[in-house]
Amino acid sequence: MKNRFDVLVDFVIESITGGVREVYVMLCDGSTYLITSLPSQRARAVARWLLSRQPFKTSLQAIIAKYRSVYYLHERGRDISEARLDGNGLYIFGDHDGLSREDEELLAKHAEWISLGSTPYMSWHAAAYLAYLLKRQV
């Protein structure tokens, strides 16, 4: 998320505290962070911690290959209430600009596009709602 590190931190906090086992954060330059736990639920502490971590380089395709079920949250996706969600799946969130054309072409082949409806949501709101839906399924 360009120039919105605060939103990224909120997304990570909401995802992990919502019960997600791991969060991949992939930046525009390909730097990727794998987060499986947090040192705190306070945004400032999480931000410092994230900045101190060493990123690794990978591709979206390599991450997708690790999962049987892949979902892309997009405004043009199928209504989430009609989808059969896999709690062990990979859920991909973009920012308000969306993903690159290349990434969306890859996801058109390898992911089910799902939507929370016509209302745009911040990614961290969407993460919290998705966590709620997945917990309700169990």
UniProtKB/Swiss-Prot annotation:
It is found in: Cytoplasm. Its main location: cytoplasm. Pfam families: Methyltrn_RNA_2 (PF04013). This is tRNA (pseudouridine(54)-N(1))-methyltransferase. Keywords: Cytoplasm, Methyltransferase, S-adenosyl-L-methionine, Transferase, tRNA processing. InterPro entries: Alpha/beta_knot_MTases, TrmY, tRNA_m1G_MTases_N. S-adenosyl-L-methionine binds at residues 73, 94. It comes from Pyrobaculum aerophilum (strain ATCC 51768 / DSM 7523 / JCM 9630 / CIP 104966 / NBRC 100827 / IM2). GO terms for molecular function: S-adenosylmethionine-dependent methyltransferase activity; tRNA methyltransferase activity. Specifically catalyzes the N1-methylation of pseudouridine at position 54 (Psi54) in tRNAs. The gene is trmY.
